[in-house]
């Protein structure tokens, strides 16, 4: 099993805060020279610890002001129904997150839209999907906390295989 030490955790925390940091700045922040720092980053990419680097956009600046949580219950929770629903949802760009849940509902979606009219069209689409039994939605009034950085133990950790 591969272990991540304090230095690896420091690298990951720095990259989670600013993925555009230069390797030289990153190396300085964890007290390494640039080459070993670069090698550690590459190793964590190869292990799948670092999946990708992205740019986070402002939904508000882009007019995506309607943040809705949608609870979806299916008629039957059988593999074929679940798979079909998940395939449909995966094609929708407004669906930011989708989780298969325990209990009721079967799925929880977070959808980001520009208007109530767009939400109405999306809900109309959902109601027409085969196997959908019930839909409930809740609007987010205010985002109290949002983060993308994962909580990592400062002392290091062992990776799962």
Curated annotation (Swiss-Prot):
This is Bkd operon transcriptional regulator. Disulfide bonds: none annotated. The keyword Hydrolase does not apply. Residues 23-42 bind DNA. The keyword Transcription applies. Positive regulator of the bkd operon for branched-chain keto acid dehydrogenase complex. It comes from Pseudomonas putida. Keywords: Activator, DNA-binding, Transcription, Transcription regulation. GO terms for cellular component: cytosol. Residues 4-65 form the HTH asnC-type domain. It holds the Pfam family AsnC_trans_reg. InterPro entries: AsnC-type_HTH_dom, Dimeric_a/b-barrel, Tscrpt_reg_AsnC-like, Tscrpt_reg_AsnC/Lrp_C, Tscrpt_reg_HTH_AsnC-type_CS, WH-like_DNA-bd_sf, WH_DNA-bd_sf. It comes from the Bacteria. One of its GO terms (biological process) is response to amino acid. Coiled coil: none annotated. GO terms for molecular function: sequence-specific DNA binding.
